[in-house]
Design a protein with these regions (language model features):
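Phosphate-binding loop of NTP-binding sites
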Residues: 36, 76-78, 87-241, 293, ...
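Short, conserved loop/helix-junction motifs that constitute active-site signature segments
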Residues: 39, 179-182, 212-217, 235-237, ...
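Nucleotide phosphate-binding/pyrophosphate-handling subdomain across enzymes
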Residues: 3-4, 8-18, 30-34, 270-379
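Extended acidic/charged loop-beta regions that coordinate divalent cations
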Residues: 64-68, 73-76, 164-198, 231-274, ...
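Beta-strand->loop->alpha-helix junctions that form or flank phosphate-binding loops
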Residues: 45, 70-71, 107-112, 236-256, ...
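N-terminal leader/targeting and accessory segments in enzymes
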Residues: 1-108, 384
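Short internal beta-strands
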Residues: 44-49, 221-225, 354-358, 377-386
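C-terminal helical cap/extension that packs against the catalytic core
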Residues: 56-60, 65, 367-429
Length: 463
C-alpha cells in the first residue's frame, strides 16, 4: 500500500484551497459545517458508496457542497489540494489508496483538531473502557470548578465540542492512526486485538492505537491491568515516561480488610461498593480518571468522592435494565469483541449468569473469552445469530478440553427467542447479561440498535 502525503494543518491553513471531505457521515458533516462557517475554503465531498451521502448530510447541505461518488481507478475530482479523511475510510480501501498515490495532502479532522486544541486536551483511548474513563475524567474535572467539555468518539464529533479551557475526548484507533501531533495528556486504558478488518493485523492495530503517544505528549497515563498494553508500551515507547495505574501511581485500587477501595497514595478514599459502576475493571477506570484529572487540576478528595457518587453510567456499558421480575437484565451491547465480553463476565462471577453471546464474526482472538468461560462457566449461554451457533459448539469443545462441565448452550434465531429462553431459565436474583463479544452488523444497524432490541424484548415479555 502507498503511504499518504501527510502534513500538520489547522483550518486556517486551508484558506484559499480546494478541500475534499472524504466520507459524509457524522464526522464529515461536522467538518463541513465548521469549514463552511470559516468561509474561505472551496469544499467538495467524496464517497465510495452508491447509496448517497446520507440523510444528515442532505439535510444540512443539500446541493450546496458537491458530492463525488468514487468509482475506482483514478476517479477523483480535479483541483483538490487537501483531502480530510473520515475515520471510517480504512487504508486498504481503493479510495484511500488512490488518494495516497496522488499529490493530494491527506489529513484528518482529528489531527486538525489536535493541531488547534491539543495543548488543552486530555485524549483517552483503549480497547475497553475509554468511554467511561473519558466521561469520568470530565465529570471529576467539572466538579472542581474547571471549564471542561467532553466528546469525540462518543457520538459528539470533535469539531462539535465547545472549546472549553479543558477538552476531554475519547479517540478511536481509526482516529489515532494518522495523527501528526499528540495532545497534552494521553490516556490508554487497555489493549487487546480489535478492528482487525480495518487495521489489517493485530500488530498494526496496536501501533495505530498507540500512535496517540508518538508526538511528545506532556503526560502519559496507562492502565496497569492489561499485559498486552504493558508489552506494547515497552516495545514501541520504551523511553517515554508514563504513569502506570497500580504501579506507584497516586490513585489506585486496593483490597483492604476484604473489601476493594479506591486509594490515594496508599490511603483508602472510598469503598468500590459505593461507586455507581459495575465491575472490577470499572474501578480501575475510576483510578485512571482520577489520575488523568489530576494532571489539569488539584484533586480535593471530598469533592472527588461526591463527583464519583453522582456519576451516571453511560448506556450500553453494563447498563442495568429495569424489570419487575427480580431478574437483573444488563445491557452490555458495546462489548463488540471477545475480550470485552470476558471482562463483563469476570465482573459478575459472584452471580448466577445467563449470557447472550454472538453476532458478526470478525476472526479476532477469542482466548480471553475462552479462558473466562472455562474457568468460570456461566449457568447458561444463549447463542445469538449469526455466529452464536458455531460459537456454542466451540465453547462446548473448550470446556471438554479444559475438563469442565459445559454450561447449558442454547442457540436462538433472534432477540425475542433469546429473551424468552432467558426468562424461562432465570430465577429472581439471576443476571441476564447481553455482552455479545461481537459486532452487530448483519443483524442490526449498530450496537445501539441491538441494545434497543434487547430492551424492547424485555419490555414485551415483562410479567
Amino acid at each position: 500500500m502507498h503511504s499518504p502525503k501527510r502534513k500538520k494543518l489547522t483550518p486556517a491553513d486551508l484558506a484559499g484551497l480546494t478541500v475534499a471531505i472524504v466520507g459524509t457521515g457524522r464526522e464529515g458533516v461536522s467538518l463541513a459545517r465548521m469549514l463552511s462557517a470559516q468561509g474561505d475554503v472551496t469544499l467538495t465531498a467524496i464517497i465510495d458508496s452508491e447509496g448517497g451521502p446520507g440523510e444528515e448530510w442532505d439535510r444540512e447541505f443539500g446541493r450546496t457542497i458537491p458530492v463525488h461518488v468514487f468509482n475506482g481507478d483514478s476517479d477523483l475530482p480535479e483541483g483538490i489540494d487537501v483531502a480530510i479523511m473520515s475515520p471510517g475510510i480504512a487504508p486498504h480501501r481503493p479510495l484511500f489508496q488512490v488518494l495516497a498515490r496522488s499529490d493530494i495532502i491527506m489529513t484528518s479532522g482529528t489531527d486538525m483538531f489536535m493541531a488547534v486544541y491539543g495543548d488543552r486536551m486530555v485524549a483517552v483511548t483503549g480497547s475497553k473502557g475509554k468511554s467511561t474513563t473519558s466521561a469520568l475524567t470530565a465529570h471529576i474535572i467539572s466538579a472542581h470548578g474547571v471549564d471542561v467539555s467532553w466528546g469525540g468518539n462518543v457520538g459528539i464529533p470533535l469539531w462539535d465540542i465547545r472549546p472549553a479551557d479543558v477538552i476531554v475526548a475519547e479517540v478511536s484507533s481509526y482516529q489515532c492512526s494518522s495523527l501528526t501531533s499528540s495532545p497534552m495528556v494521553t490516556v490508554v486504558t487497555s489493549l487487546f486485538e480489535e478492528h482487525l478488518d480495518w487495521h489489517g493485523s493485530a500488530e498494526q492495530y496496536f501501533a495505530d492505537k498507540l500512535n496517540l503517544l508518538a508526538h511528545t505528549p506532556q503526560s502519559v497515563i496507562v492502565g496497569g491491568q492489561s499485559q498486552i498494553l504493558t508489552q506494547q508500551m515497552d516495545l514501541l515507547y520504551p523511553h517515554l515516561p508514563r504513569t502506570t495505574i497500580g504501579e506507584g501511581s497516586t490513585w489506585s485500587v486496593s483490597e483492604v480488610g476484604g473489601e476493594w477501595h479506591i486509594t490515594r497514595d496508599g490511603h483508602t478514599v472510598m469503598a468500590c461498593s459505593e461507586l455507581p459502576l459495575l465491575g472490577h475493571h470499572n474501578w480501575w477506570n475510576v483510578a485512571i480518571a482520577l489520575e488523568a484529572a489530576s494532571t489539569v487540576t488539584t484533586i480535593d478528595t471530598d469533592t472527588a468522592i461526591t463527583a464519583l457518587r453522582s456519576f451516571h453510567p453511560l448506556p450500553h456499558r453494563l447498563e442495568p435494565v429495569d424489570d419487575p421480575s427480580g431478574v437483573v437484565f444488563i445491557n452490555d451491547s458495546l462489548a463488540t469483541n471477545p475480550s470485552a465480553a470476558a471482562v463483563a463476565l469476570g465482573s459478575l462471577r459472584d452471580r448466577r449468569v445467563i449470557v447472550l453471546l454472538g453476532g458478526a464474526d470478525r476472526g479476532v482472538d477469542r482466548t480471553p473469552l475462552r479462558q473466562e468461560l472455562t474457568a468460570h462457566p456461566p449457568a447458561v449461554i444463549i447463542g445469538l445469530p449469526a455466529s452464536g451457533e458455531g460459537l456454542l459448539r466451540d465453547i462446548e469443545q473448550w470446556c471438554v478440553e479444559a475438563g469442565v462441565t459445559p454450561p447449558a448452550c442454547v442457540p436462538v434465531s433472534g432477540m425475542d427467542e433469546a429473551i424468552a429462553e432467558a426468562r424461562n431459565r432465570a430465577r429472581a436474583g439471576d443476571v441476564v447479561l447481553m455482552s455479545p463479544g461481537a459486532p452487530s452488523f448483519g443483524q442490526y444497524r449498530d450496537y445501539e440498535h441491538r441494545a434497543e432490541d434487547f430492551k424492547r424484548a424485555i419490555a414485551d415479555t415483562r410479567p
